[in-house]
Design a protein with these regions (language model features):
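Conserved ABC transporter NBD signature motif
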Residues: 59-75
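Conserved ABC ATPase "signature" region
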Residues: 97, 101-124
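Catalytic Walker B motif of ABC-type/P-loop ATPase nucleotide-binding domains
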Residues: 153-157
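Helical segment within the ABC ATPase nucleotide-binding domain
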Residues: 167-179
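ABC ATPase "signature
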Residues: 211-212
Length: 241
């Protein structure tokens, strides 16, 4: 779609003398899936934190659904970190009820029911988080984000800890979610980006090394596919599933 839900203009972030990201121009359309690829330390997490309103740009501009103040952005963002941030002694249901309450979500019961269904959690709804596997914790983290009724969903390495079947199921659900909200995620997995994204950004050392569809990135770099292009522009190895 032509309307952008998320926009970064000339975004630069410095920590003391270290530049985490430099002159980043990034957009994510409404009701779309946008992927960030890159090796560790490339700047993916910095961009995600900026989109979530967790950090300020040193220079440049960040806009999410027309909002630029972090306190406004945080109200419309659902964030799923690579390592789930969950209260160990709460049950799955209690976790979601608490999250919906914090955001004063309308129709909270329906939102929770939908999140449980999307994340395949109905069979563990009464289980405490501390008794769940890593894969289940990741799904609870996603369900928690959905309960805040976000306009933009941000996922950092969302498939970490999931088995192949769970990964495919979650990808299918993300595609469905993108019919209603904007989804932005980071990943090391080429197949994940190809499967889900029409718009892909490849980062290297804090700058955008390539941007476009999987096909256009490959073509622009004289490669047969996105895997070859990723290796060429980053000089890194590739993670297959």
């Amino acid at each position: 779609m032509s309307n952008n839900a998320v926009k970064l203009e000339s975004f630069t972030k410095k920590y003391a003398e270290k530049i985490a990201c430099s002159s980043i121009d990034f957009t994510a359309g409404e009701c779309s899936v946008t992927g960030l690829l890159g090796p560790n330390g490339a700047g993916k997490s910095t961009i995600l934190k900026a989109i979530c309103g967790e950090i300020y740009p040193t220079t440049g501009f960040v806009s999410v659904c027309g909002f630029s103040k972090p306190e406004d952005i945080k109200k419309i963002i659902g964030y799923v970190p690579e390592i789930p941030e969950l209260e160990e002694n709460l049950t799955v249901k209690e976790t979601l009820v608490l999250e919906a309450g914090l955001y004063s979500v309308k129709d909270a019961v329906d939102r929770i029911k939908e999140a449980l269904s999307i994340c395949q959690l109905t069979d563990v709804v009464s289980c405490k988080v501390k008794n769940l596997s890593k894969g289940y914790r990741q799904r609870v983290s996603l369900a928690k984000a959905l309960c805040s009724d976000p306009k933009v969903l941000v996922l950092d390495e969302f498939s970490a800890g999931l088995d192949p079947v769970q990964t495919v199921q979650l990808r299918n659900n993300i595609k469905k979610l993108s019919e209603k909200i904007t989804v932005i995620f980071s990943t090391h997995h080429i197949e994940e980006a190809v499967s889900l994204c029409k718009d892909i950004y490849i980062l290297k050392r804090g700058v955008i090394a390539a941007h476009g569809t999987a096909e256009s990135i490959a073509k622009d770099n004289g490669c047969h596919n996105l895997e070859e292009a990723f290796l060429k522009v980053t000089g890194e190895g590739i993670i297959h599933e």
